[in-house]
């Protein structure tokens, strides 16, 4: 199986505090990899390394190696804007731009110069909304504000916005934590459909969600990677006692 992204001996420091302690983890292509663990364990910090979002935090320092298709994404010649188009992100709370539904999706392809005509832009917007399972619900109201949508629809709009720039990887940081069970189920179905075209890494507090949507799971605890493996194996016969204790609810 092809490895799309790889972290090798990744350490993250916030000032003098070491938040991640030498994480080595492979992200397989066209699979969903779930990062689980109790609050404050480092899973979101590690996720943000994959598209250099930690660069925006004052005092943050990253050591080790992170590669995308074998290329070090922290090399000085890397264009971070281009990297974040290749490695998109969906955040915990739905965060549509204060623009129309259409413009939320059109914004990325337009600023990245991915379309040559208005017709092509319309095609990209429609395709992205369809992939996000949202087009039929909004096709007659594309001019309305993205913020007018329900929470679940807003999160699917954010997913459409991410995929409109043709990323290779989509990072999701607890994308369902602010959603009700019905909206969560829609997002989970969408994640499963999207992995045909994208590599997905999802941070989740929900063990049930990790079991439903992922093929691989990595367990974090106190800034360390405890274990990683196929999700089914991890949830039925984990190697580490800390993993067993976490997935059975003994701590977390």
UniProtKB/Swiss-Prot annotation:
Keywords on record: ATP-binding, Cell inner membrane, Cell membrane, Membrane, Nucleotide-binding, Phosphate transport, Translocase, Transport
Subcellular location, record wording: Cell inner membrane
Family annotation (Gene3D superfamilies): P-loop containing nucleotide triphosphate hydrolases (3.40.50.300)
Top EC category: translocase
EC numbers on record: 7.3.2.1
Catalytic activity reported: phosphate(out) + ATP + H2O = ADP + 2 phosphate(in) + H(+)
Keyword Flavoprotein listed: no
GO cellular component, one term: plasma membrane
Positions that bind ATP: 37-44
ABC transporter domain: residues covered: 5-247
Keyword Transport attached: yes
Membrane topology reported for the UniProt record: Peripheral membrane protein
Single biological process term from Gene Ontology: phosphate ion transmembrane transport
Gene Ontology molecular functions: ATP binding; ATP hydrolysis activity; ATPase-coupled phosphate ion transmembrane transporter activity
SMART domains, sorted: AAA
Family of the protein in this entry: Belongs to the ABC transporter superfamily. Phosphate importer (TC 3.A.1.7) family.
Self-association state and partner proteins as the record states: The complex is composed of two ATP-binding proteins (PstB), two transmembrane proteins (PstC and PstA) and a solute-binding protein (PstS).
Function noted in UniProt: Part of the ABC transporter complex PstSACB involved in phosphate import. Responsible for energy coupling to the transport system.
NCBIfam families: 3a0107s01c2 (TIGR00972)
Name of the featured protein: Phosphate import ATP-binding protein PstB
Native source organism of the sequence: Bartonella henselae (strain ATCC 49882 / DSM 28221 / CCUG 30454 / Houston 1)
């Amino acid at each position: 199986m092809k490895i799309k992204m790889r972290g090798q001996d990744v350490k993250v420091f916030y000032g003098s505090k070491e938040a991640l302690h030498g994480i080595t983890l492979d992200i397989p292509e066209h699979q969903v990899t779930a990062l689980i663990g109790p609050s404050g364990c480092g899973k979101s910090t590690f996720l943000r390394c994959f598209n250099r979002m930690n660069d925006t935090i004052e005092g943050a320092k990253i050591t080790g190696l992170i590669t995308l298709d074998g290329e070090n994404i922290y090399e000085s010649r890397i264009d971070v804007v281009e990297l974040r188009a290749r490695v998109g992100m969906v955040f915990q709370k739905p965060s549509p731009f204060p623009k129309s539904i259409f413009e939320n999706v059109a914004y990325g392809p337009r600023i990245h110069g991915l379309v040559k005509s208005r017709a092509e832009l319309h095609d990209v917007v429609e395709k992205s909304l369809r992939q996000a399972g949202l087009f039929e619900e909004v096709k007659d109201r594309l001019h309305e504000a993205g913020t007018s949508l329900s929470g679940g629809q807003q999160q699917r709009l954010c997913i459409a916005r991410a995929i409109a720039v043709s990323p290779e990887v989509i990072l999701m940081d607890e994308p369902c934590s602010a959603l009700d069970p019905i909206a969560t189920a829609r997002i989970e179905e969408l994640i499963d459909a999207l992995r045909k075209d994208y590599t997905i890494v999802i941070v989740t507090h929900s063990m049930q969600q990790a079991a439903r949507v992922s093929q691989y799971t990595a367990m974090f605890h106190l800034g360390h990677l405890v274990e990683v493996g196929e999700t089914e194996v991890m949830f039925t016969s984990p190697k580490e006692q800390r993993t067993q204790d976490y997935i059975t609810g003994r701590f977390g």
